[in-house]
């Protein structure tokens, strides 16, 4: 797994590239991995690992729920980087 500097850079890239929202999630779930790719690092979050699933409501013409799977470490990097970006605004 990448070191903290690399993970934070990946989180910044995901945020600035609109791969994941900057706002607070509407729901956050934690538990065993769902064997889905992590939105931040693109590596699978296996069932033997813990993950956060972030859910964001989507309004508009096609309402729904966007889900993002993150390793715990990637979630921490996302949280730090998104709050840093908000502070700059």
Report each predicted region and the residues it spans.
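Short Cys/His-rich "knuckle" micro-motifs
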Residues: 48-53, 82
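Short, flexible, mixed-charge glycine/proline-rich loop motifs
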Residues: 22-36
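Short linker/helix segments within small regulatory modules
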Residues: 53-68
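Short cysteine-rich clusters marking metal-coordination/redox-active sites
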Residues: 38-42
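Short, charged low-complexity linear segments at domain edges
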Residues: 3-24
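Short metal-binding segments enriched for Cys and/or His
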Residues: 5-8, 64-89
């Amino acid at each position: 797994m990448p070191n903290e500097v690399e993970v934070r850079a990946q989180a910044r890239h995901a945020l600035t590239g609109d791969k994941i929202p900057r706002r607070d999630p509407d729901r956050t779930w934690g538990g065993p991995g769902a064997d889905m790719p992590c939105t931040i690092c693109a590596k699978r979050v296996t069932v033997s690992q813990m993950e956060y699933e972030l859910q964001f409501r989507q309004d508009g013409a096609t309402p729904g729920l966007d889900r993002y799977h993150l390793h715990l470490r990637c979630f921490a990097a996302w949280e730090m980087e998104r709050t840093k970006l908000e502070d700059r605004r």
